[in-house]
């Protein structure tokens, strides 16, 4: 039993004396790790910022385009006279010369494309 205790104390003493690291070495190691962590954080932050800017650009692009659900205002309906220089026909209509009806009124009407 005494040999076990003696061996344990001997191993414990060796581990304590040889296992102690230099305090400056520990500080240097911690500084390296924190600097690496900071550089990784900066890299991740820049990457996230780029992705957010791309997403924002896509969202702004969607809002800048005309919405298909929005109603056109002040457009001219089908079979209504229009001006050839300033056609304000509704979407899906085009300002053309009439074929049969309306030839004696105005020269252009809104027709389906």
From Swiss-Prot:
It is found in: Secreted. Its main location: secreted. Residues 1-21 form the signal peptide. Expressed by the venom gland. GO terms for cellular component: extracellular region. Disulfide bonds join 75-90, 82-95, 89-110. GO terms for molecular function: sodium channel inhibitor activity; toxin activity. InterPro entries: Toxin_22 (IPR012627). It holds the Pfam family Toxin_22. Keywords: Disulfide bond, Ion channel impairing toxin, Knottin, Secreted, Signal, Toxin. Residues 22-74 form a propeptide. The keyword Signal applies. It comes from the Eukaryota. The keyword Disulfide bond applies. Probable ion channel inhibitor. The presence of a 'disulfide through disulfide knot' structurally defines this protein as a knottin. Belongs to the neurotoxin 14 (magi-1) family. 01 (HNTX-16) subfamily. This is U11-theraphotoxin-Hhn1m.
